[in-house]
C-alpha cells in the first residue's frame, strides 16, 4: 500500500485534497504466501478473507476470497438502520505466466456479489406492516477480467498491453420505486 498525503497525486493533482491511497497488487513469489483475516465490529459486522499466492518456476497464482456480513444496526434506537444488513462475496483468482526473463503475462477475474437491505428495523426482521413498511434494497453484481502482457526489448525499451472488461449490474428498490442498471465497459491500454 502506498499512501500519499496532501494534494500531490500524479493523476489527480491538487484535486486530491486529502491525499491518495494506491493499492499495489501482490505478485506470487516462490515462497508460499498464505493468509487468513477474521474481523468483528461493534457495529454488528463480520469480515472473513483469505489469500494464497505462490510461484512455480514458469507459472504463478494468487487467489483472494472474502465474505463480509453486517446485521441491521440501529445504535440510536430510532427504528431505522444506520448500517444496513448486507452480505458480500468477493472472489479474485489470477494466473501469472513467465515465458522468459523478458516476457510475462497475467490473467485475472474479479467477481463480487452483494445484497443489502436497509430501512425500518421491523421490516428487515420480517415484521413489515402499514406502519413499518420503509426499506431500501440494493442488489449488486460486478465482474471484471484483467489481462496484462509485458515484453522487455532492453533496459529502456519495452511494450505493455493491459486490458479489462467489466460487467456491472445493480437493482435498487424502495417501496414506490425500482431502479435497474446494467453496464459493460472495456479498456485497452497498449504502452511502450
How should these model regions be labeled?
Residues 3, 11, 15-37, 50:
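N-terminal periplasmic accessory domains that precede
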Residues 4, 24, 49-55, 64, ...:
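Transmembrane beta-barrel domains of outer membrane proteins
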Residues 8-11, 70:
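Short beta-strands and strand-coil junctions in structured, solvent-facing domains, enriched
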Residues 15-17, 39, 44-46, 87-89, ...:
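Residues that define the transmembrane beta-barrel architecture of outer-membrane proteins
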Residues 30, 57-58, 101, 155:
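Short coil turns and loop connectors of transmembrane beta-barrels in diderm outer membranes
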Residues 36-40, 50, 63-69, 107-111, ...:
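Transmembrane beta-barrel strands of outer-membrane/channel proteins
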Residues 70-90, 96-98, 102-159, 166-184:
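Flexible loop and strand-edge segments within Gram-negative outer membrane beta-barrel domains
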Residues 185-191:
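Conserved small/polar residues in nucleotide/adenosyl-binding loops
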Amino acid at each position: 500500500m502506498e499512501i500519499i498525503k496532501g494534494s500531490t497525486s500524479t493523476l489527480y493533482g491538487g484535486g486530491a485534497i486529502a491525499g491518495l491511497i494506491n493499492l499495489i497488487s501482490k505478485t506470487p513469489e516462490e515462497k508460499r504466501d498464505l493468509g487468513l483475516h477474521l474481523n468483528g465490529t461493534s457495529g454488528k459486522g463480520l469480515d472473513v478473507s483469505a489469500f494464497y499466492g505462490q510461484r512455480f518456476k514458469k507459472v504463478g497464482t494468487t487467489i483472494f476470497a472474502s465474505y463480509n456480513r453486517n446485521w441491521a444496526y440501529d445504535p440510536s434506537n430510532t427504528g431505522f438502520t444506520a448500517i444496513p444488513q448486507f452480505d458480500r462475496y468477493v472472489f479474485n483468482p489470477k494466473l501469472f505466466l513467465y515465458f522468459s526473463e523478458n516476457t510475462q503475462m497475467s490473467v485475472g477475474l474479479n467477481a463480487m456479489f452483494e445484497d443489502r437491505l436497509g430501512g425500518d428495523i421491523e421490516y428487515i426482521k420480517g415484521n413489515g406492516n402499514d406502519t413499518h413498511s420503509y426499506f431500501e434494497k440494493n442488489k449488486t453484481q460486478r465482474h471484471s477480467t484483467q489481462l496484462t502482457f509485458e515484453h522487455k526489448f532492453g533496459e529502456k525499451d519495452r511494450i505493455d498491453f493491459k486490458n479489462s472488461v467489466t460487467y456491472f449490474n445493480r437493482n435498487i428498490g424502495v417501496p414506490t420505486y425500482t431502479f435497474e442498471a446494467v453496464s459493460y465497459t472495456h479498456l485497452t491500454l497498449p504502452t511502450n
